[in-house]
Each structure stands twice: as structure tokens, then as C-alpha cells.
Swiss-Prot record:
Lineage: Eukaryota, Metazoa, Chordata, Craniata, Vertebrata
InterPro entries registered for this protein in UniProt: Globin, Globin-like_sf, Globin/Proto, Hemoglobin_b, Hemoglobin_oxygen_transport
Designated name of the protein: Hemoglobin subunit beta-Z
Keyword terms, alphabetized: Heme, Iron, Metal-binding, Oxygen transport, Transport
GO cellular component, one term: hemoglobin complex
GO biological process: hydrogen peroxide catabolic process
Complexes and interactors: Heterotetramer of two alpha chains and two beta chains.
């Protein structure tokens, strides 16, 4: 991802921005394929495990961060039920992305 030495470097990093868009697009894909997350994310699981060597705990961490950001952004609309649904979705995605590691 290049220079990640400071918050400013990260915020201005086009590769980070592009990856963020991919992550959010993948969440949309997850919503469309909630009953088949393992298969939907099989290729990404393999990529992150075998090629990128990403610690699978990072998938859980990112999911939790996304839920926090959504709750902050949507405040009143982010009811306990909405929060539970998002937590279930990001946990399912994290599990699917971690599948290749098992």
C-alpha cells in the first residue's frame, strides 16, 4: 500500500482509497449473497491467505470498525436491531474471508 507512516499519509494514499472502495463494494456483494458468503468470498479468502498473508483477525477488526463508523454516521437510524444485523453481516464476511486459513 506504500507509505503508511502517518495518518496524513494514509488518508492521502490512492491505493488505500481504492482498497476501501473494493471493501465497501464487497460488502454490497455480501448483502446480495448472504446465504452463500463462503462461496462468494472463496477467491478473496484464498488471495488474502496464500498471496497477501493477511492476519485473519484483521477481517474481524475491520468489520467492527465499519459497524462503529456506520453507527456514528447514522446515529438515530442505527437502532440496536440495525446494529445487530450489521454485526452479523460483517462477522459472516470475516468468517468467509478466514475460511482458507482453517
Amino acid at each position: 500500500f506504500g507509505n503508511l507512516s502517518s495518518a496524513q499519509a494514509i488518508m492521502g494514499n490512492p491505493r488505500i482509497r481504492a482498497h476501501g472502495k473494493k471493501v465497501l463494494t464487497s460488502l454490497g456483494l455480501a448483502v446480495q449473497n448472504m446465504d452463500n458468503l463462503k462461496e462468494t468470498f472463496a477467491h478473496l479468502s484464498e488471495l488474502h491467505c496464500d498471496k497477501l498473508h493477511v492476519d485473519p483477525e484483521n477481517f474481524k477488526l475491520l468489520g467492527n470498525v465499519l459497524v462503529i463508523v456506520l453507527s456514528t454516521h447514522f446515529a438515530k437510524e442505527f437502532t440496536p436491531e440495525v446494529q445487530a444485523a450489521w454485526q452479523k453481516l460483517v462477522a459472516g464476511v470475516a468468517n468467509a474471508l478466514s475460511h482458507k486459513y482453517h
